[in-house]
Each structure stands twice: as structure tokens, then as C-alpha cells.
Amino acid sequence: MSIIDNRKAYHDYFIEEKYEAGLVLEGWEVKAIRAGRANIKEAYIIVRGEEIFILGMHITPLASASTHIRTDPTRTRKLLLHGAEIARLIGKVERAGFTLVPLDLHYAKGRVKAEIGLAKGKKQYDKREDEKKRDWEREKQRLMRVKA
């Protein structure tokens, strides 16, 4: 079950492959995510050396967060993947013109995981075409309901 979805990613990109990655989080961040106080709409993923990081993910601290901890809502967080997956992703991002986008945050075995997608950007006409398809499907469903 998803905690937070990034629907904008599906609108702006063609998602080719999906991967599940762990996140390196602090305690207050996990509590805030459980409370649904995270935002990944403006987040993006970069490769630094042999590691993958997520930037721009905003986690709003709870009011009850400890006062002796300095909370940084938009700090850079490391993503945890297997070495072979990282190597494959780095190769595709650097050579094939793909990008990495966060798709959602969810729980797996009690831990917060991020689903990331290997994506290619959509052109404006692709977005319009998708919208036309979606509208036609909606209209088709409406017509079927009226007939029945």
C-alpha cells in the first residue's frame, strides 16, 4: 500500500522500469512519513559516484519532534539498492538518455521504501495524446453506463 504517490511523474515521463529502493532516514522522518507529511512531487534522483541520492523530497517535521535535533526537511537522502541494480541504472542514465524519478513511498516489511522509475521524458504532444485517450475511455465508460 502506498503512502505517497507521485502522479505527476506518470504525466511527465514514460516509465520503462521500476525498482524498489530503501531510504536512509532519521527517526523523526519515519514518524513524519507515517503521519503522511511527506511530498515527492518536486523530488528528483541523482547519481554521485557509485551511489544514488534523492533530492527535493520534503518531509515536514511533526510538532512533537525533539528540540535537540535539528530537522532539515529537504536534506539529501541516500537510496539503498543492490550493486548490480545501481550499475545498470547508472549505465542507462549516463548513456541511454534516461532519468530516474521517484514514483511513490510505501511500506515493505515495516520499512519505508521508495519506488523509483527509469523514465524517458514525454513531449507535449505525447501528453496531449494521453489526455485524449483518458478522456475517450471516460466517455466510453459513461456511454456504457447510459446504455445499461
UniProtKB/Swiss-Prot annotation:
The keyword RNA-binding applies. It comes from the Bacteria. PROSITE patterns: SSRP. Pfam families: SmpB (PF01668). It is found in: Cytoplasm. The keyword 4Fe-4S does not apply. One of its GO terms (biological process) is trans-translation. Keywords: Cytoplasm, RNA-binding. InterPro entries: SmpB, SsrA-bd_prot, SsrA-bd_prot_CS. GO terms for molecular function: RNA binding. GO terms for cellular component: cytosol. Required for rescue of stalled ribosomes mediated by trans-translation. Binds to transfer-messenger RNA (tmRNA), required for stable association of tmRNA with ribosomes. tmRNA and SmpB together mimic tRNA shape, replacing the anticodon stem-loop with SmpB. tmRNA is encoded by the ssrA gene; the 2 termini fold to resemble tRNA(Ala) and it encodes a 'tag peptide', a short internal open reading frame. During trans-translation Ala-aminoacylated tmRNA acts like a tRNA, entering the A-site of stalled ribosomes, displacing the stalled mRNA. Belongs to the SmpB family. HAMAP family: SmpB. NCBIfam families: PRK05422.1, smpB. This is SsrA-binding protein. The lineage of its organism: Bacteria, Pseudomonadati, Pseudomonadota, Betaproteobacteria, Rhodocyclales. The gene is smpB.
